A protein has these predicted regions:
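A short, N-terminal "cap"/entry segment at the start of jelly-roll beta-barrel domains
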Residues: 1-40, 126-151
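Conserved short histidine dyad/triad with adjacent acidic residue
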Residues: 32-34, 39-58, 94-96
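Short acidic-glycine-tyrosine-enriched beta hairpin
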Residues: 37, 75-104
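Conserved catalytic motifs of the protein kinase core domain
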Residues: 41, 63, 107
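Short, well-ordered beta-strand segments in beta-rich or mixed alpha/beta enzyme
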Residues: 46-48, 68-74, 101, 110-113
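Glycine- and acidic-residue-biased ligand/ion/polar-headgroup-sensing regions
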Residues: 50, 59-78
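Ligand-binding loop in jelly-roll beta-barrel domains
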Residues: 95-123
Length: 151
């Protein structure tokens, strides 16, 4: 049986995720676990702050998530709570609507397998308050970030 309380995140090397302005985005950190250059898949642990929301965004490629610790809350652009995924929940997703995410009463740690299957097609679009694209992030961007953080 999965013991959702035993995950020791102190072993994770958390790094900031640069926002559209180049400064670290609020309420989010990441640890890139693997970059598969052949298949164009990136495996990442994200940590979202408790009772906070990350940047508004849209997934533009296939992905899978697994909530490792805490609970992942997903919100619609109007702020309405759309979904709650506690530790132990897996979800396979496709490109979809704009949303934001965050932790519940504690920080949430979520494993994402990002699957653009292309070096240049976007994985995410970061959106402004009018849902206009501020920044697109693709496989090469995450690969470069991984190389920067690994050096």
């Amino acid at each position: 049986m999965l013991d959702v309380n035993s995950f020791d995140e102190s072993k994770i090397d958390w790094k900031p995720l640069p926002g559209p302005d180049g400064d670290p985005a609020e309420h989010i950190s990441l640890s890139i676990l693997n970059v598969d250059d052949k298949a164009k898949i990136v495996d990442v642990l994200f940590k979202f702050s408790a009772n906070e929301k990350i940047l508004m965004h849209r997934h533009t490629s296939n992905y899978s998530t697994f909530t490792v610790k805490g609970e992942l809350k997903t919100y619609l652009p109007n702020g309405e709570l759309k979904d709650v995924r506690p530790a132990g929940v897996f979800k396979a997703g496709e490109p979809g609507e704009a949303h934001t995410e965050g932790g519940g009463d504690e920080d949430v740690v979520v494993y994402f397998s990002l699957r653009p299957y292309s070096a240049t097609d976007p994985i995410y679009e970061i959106l402004d308050e009018n849902l206009e694209v501020l920044q697109a992030m693709n496989f090469e961007d995450l690969k470069g970030l991984n190389e920067e953080y690994s050096s």
